[in-house]
């Protein structure tokens, strides 16, 4: 009996001293997505959807002006997927052999004006009502800026903005914070701002559309996953998310 008790005690002590199994340290696969700043809300949502269906994968985003992202790719910045807010910037990327295969058109977007709640400056459109007001637009080198310039020319309006931003989300932020009387943004940004702003339609805005394209970066180290992410964007789930955000589907 004593021997049995000693044996049981020894076994218990041995079990207590045995280290617990080490937690899994398998590294997660990181998928790097470069995307236009106007896609920040929708692509963040798409990233969560993708991670949910791909255990062990983390989607890392870099949101910026499309032209800035192309420059970064040219300089060798590592990325797996690139989504541009207009065709000219994607063309720059493909011409420089930065993309693998043919990028896919997945959405279009148009411009509108946002103003602080109540429209205290009395803005009526992209017209003389913005003269002398604190108007903020995108810089001409980025898609929303190029579209703004085209639309202003179409309407015969000369704009004198107090600030030109490299990201459309920065234009939105300045209106939301009351730093600007009006800002020219995409309709998707106006929808994302919600009750923080009022929206003023721009005449003939539907005549100046920006096309959004997405593709796999040529130097991607995760091209299979990158292609699957692109498939999500252009598939039914991705298109639903984009449509809900206000994008027009191709």
Residues of each region from the PLM?
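Exported/periplasmic ABC-transporter solute-binding proteins
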Residues: 17-52, 67, 71-74, 86-87, ...
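Acidic, polar ligand-binding/catalytic clefts
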Residues: 88-99, 104-106
């Amino acid at each position: 009996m004593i021997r049995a008790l000693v044996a049981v005690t020894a076994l218990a002590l041995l079990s207590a001293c045995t280290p617990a199994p080490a937690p899994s340290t398998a590294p997660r696969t990181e998928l790097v997505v470069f995307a236009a700043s106007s896609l920040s809300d929708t692509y963040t949502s798409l990233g969560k959807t993708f991670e949910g269906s791909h255990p062990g994968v983390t989607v890392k985003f870099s949101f910026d002006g499309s032209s800035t992202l192309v420059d970064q790719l040219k300089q060798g910045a590592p990325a797996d997927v690139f989504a541009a807010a207009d065709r000219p910037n994607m063309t720059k990327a493909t011409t420089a052999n930065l993309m693998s295969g043919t990028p896919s058109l997945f959405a279009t977007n148009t411009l509108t004006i946002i103003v602080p709640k109540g429209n205290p400056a009395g803005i009526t459109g992209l017209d003389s009502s913005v003269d002398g007001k604190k108007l903020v637009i995108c810089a001409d080198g980025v898609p929303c800026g190029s579209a703004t310039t085209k639309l202003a020319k179409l309407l015969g309006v000369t704009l004198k903005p107090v600030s030109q931003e490299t990201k459309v989300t920065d234009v939105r932020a300045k209106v939301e914070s009351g730093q600007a009387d009006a800002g020219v943004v995409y309709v998707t940004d106006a929808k994302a701002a919600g009750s923080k702003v009022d929206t003023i339609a721009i005449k003939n805005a539907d005549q100046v559309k920006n096309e959004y394209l997405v593709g796999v970066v040529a130097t991607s180290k995760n091209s299979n996953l990158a292609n699957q992410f692109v498939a999500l964007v252009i598939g039914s789930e991705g298109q639903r998310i984009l449509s809900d955000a206000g994008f027009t589907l191709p």
